[in-house]
Amino acid sequence: MPVIEMRGNVDLRKALRRFAPDLEKQLRKDLANAMKPVVAKARGFAPADAPMSGWAARSFGEGKFPTYSASTIKSGITFTSIPGKVNPYGFSSMAKINNKSAAGAIYETAGRNGPQPWVGPKAGGSSKGVSRSINPEAGAQFIENLPALTMSSKGRGRLIFKAWAQDQGKAQGAALTAIDKVTKTFNAKISAGPLSKAA
């Protein structure tokens, strides 16, 4: 699943939840306000109709290949400010933009590494990294029908990564400002006296 993350120190979020839930709530609100324009722009990049007729009308020669649905792709582009898993350095996602749907992920990233190797529909095995289409050129033709990938600081893509690139750092700057503001306010509260654990 394609993801754009803003990472921060997990101890800050834990401390806010325990001692200053009002600041935690404000941080989540500010992060959402920073990221919502990127989400809206990314949804706008999903074409109303499939880039090729075969993708919408049938499963592109493979029963498990997801069909194109603009509404599904748009609803699958979401934002969350719930902290994610902590990495070995003590950081977790402070904010995350997801491209959750299978069709959305395909539209977003297809062609990053070129077309999948073709093995044909009669090949054995269950590998997901190969093309089992009856057409050996299906992968290349599929990619040719899609818009070019857009490079961003978070990766290449056609939806969330394109929106992130066109945002030109505004969302990231606003998110970092929100985190810095809450951190300073929390530190000021600590300096003013002992904090009580939230009920």
Protein language model annotation of sequence segments:
Residues 1-94, 99-104, 113-116, 120-199:
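Short, Lys/Arg-rich flexible segments
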